[in-house]
Amino acid sequence: MSSPRNGYRDRLILAVDVGSSVLRCHLYNQSGEICGSAEDKLKVLYPQAGYVEIDPESLWEQFVRVVKEAVADAGIQMSQVAGLGISTQRGTFITWNKKTGETFHNFISWQDLRAADLVSSWNRSLLLKAVHGVCTALHFFTRRKRFLAASLINFTTQHVSLRLVWVLQNIPQVRQAAEKGNCCFGTIDTWLLHKLTKGTVFATDYSNASGTAVFDPYLMCWSSFLCSLLSIPLSIFPPVEDTSHSFGLADPTIFGAPVPILALVADQQAAMFGQCCFDVGSVKLTMGTGSFISINTGETLHTSIAGLYPLIGWKVGDEVVCLAEGNASDTGTAIKWAEELNLFTSVADTEAMARSVPDCGGIYLVPSFSGLQAPINDPYACASFMGLKPSTSKSHLVRAILESVAYRNKQLYDTVLRETTIPITLIRADGGVSNNNFIMQMTADLLGQTIDKPKHTDMSSLGAAFLAGMAVYGPLKTS
């Protein structure tokens, strides 16, 4: 059936992006145009200080609902959907019983800080120092980059590794099930695939796997060394497939038709693909809940000293594209916090408020509700305003918050320049916060660069659609 609104008769690509704040679904035609959309605010739980969780059943209900609403918005039947691509926040994970499918706990978010003490303890440990020493020697004799990377390894709370160790140590059912080979680990993409296929498919892709810090991107497999070091059973991890891949069919009882699942991709890598940052030296700056700066390093994995992370951008057939990435966790978080304090009534007002004063009045915000990431790398850093005076107004505070985003963007950009020594060919921005022209202009001024921003900023969804569409329409045409 064609849509009475857009007359669309061909088959569409569904793309769902499970972000840290919002769950979005768009339907795209072959030209990459949006034909239908739906979204829902993600329900995030904060059960105690430092804990950030997502109820899996609530997420599943939201996922199914936005897909159905987007299809209805496009005015088509589910049978007209050619395929589904799923983009998800990275590093948020869950474990479940392999036999029953019952989850052992809520999703533990990438923003969760419950493992902060474990992170600090491991980073100070003699064992990790010994690992650094041995790997430094191995790198000296072999010149292999994976040994250099291991010699520099330090854990962070954003990595799955020590949050998973926390789960194994503190939730007895998980450890017991793992010991019996009856435990499955999954990031959001893996769990959604499991649910969509009624438990028949257990898999992830290279982009999501590489974002866990339990995957060895140099060997392209789960790290047996790290799992041995941390006493994590390798048996719990899913097989890793290409990013654009036929993962199976969504059970027809869910949507009313057997929708092919054709792409799983991590959100930042999806945004990189959606922005068509295919050339070495192209940079993508995403500003959403957090800020993420990624540079395409081609076939070469970057080994970082300051906290940039080597990632698999995507794998399609024989092509593997690598990225180096740095992030700041609390971009949108800081703006949302200010809104909840009634510093402004609408996010749309912040730009005008910032411009209503000539400067920040000596007020500065350290935007570290979840610690400070690269290049500072301090999980215990606390958010704080500095320079408060009796004359400080709401506009000064709002301007300081927006400026803090630009300053962190500058820090991350300088880290990329200093560490990779790759000539930057272009910079493209996306994410909800990139709609703020004050932040964008200040960032461009600080970087001394022109920053391209598309009209449509949901690049993670578009990237997932492109990757799924490749399985339907063939290779992407970039000319």
Swiss-Prot record:
The record's EC number reads: 2.7.1.30
Instruction: Name its pathway.
Output: Polyol metabolism; glycerol degradation via glycerol kinase pathway; sn-glycerol 3-phosphate from glycerol: step 1/1
Q: What class of enzyme is it?
A: transferase
Q: Which GO terms describe its cellular component?
A: cytoplasm; mitochondrion
The reply to whether Cytoplasm figures as a keyword in the UniProt entry is: yes
Residues annotated as binding ATP = S20, S21, T289, G332, G432
GO BP of this protein: glycerol catabolic process; glycerol metabolic process; glycerol-3-phosphate biosynthetic process; triglyceride metabolic process
Question: What molecular function does GO assign, one term?
Answer: glycerol kinase activity
- Provide the catalytic activity annotation: glycerol + ATP = sn-glycerol 3-phosphate + ADP + H(+)
- Highest rank taxon of the organism: Eukaryota
Q: Which UniProt keywords apply?
A: ATP-binding, Cytoplasm, Glycerol metabolism, Kinase, Nucleotide-binding, Transferase
Its family remark reads:
Belongs to the FGGY kinase family.
Question: Which function does this protein serve?
Answer: Skin-specific kinase that plays a key role in glycerol metabolism, catalyzing its phosphorylation to produce sn-glycerol 3-phosphate. Involved in skin-specific regulation of sterol regulatory element-binding protein (SREBP) processing and lipid biosynthesis.
What protein is this chain from? Glycerol kinase 5
By which gene is this protein encoded? gk5
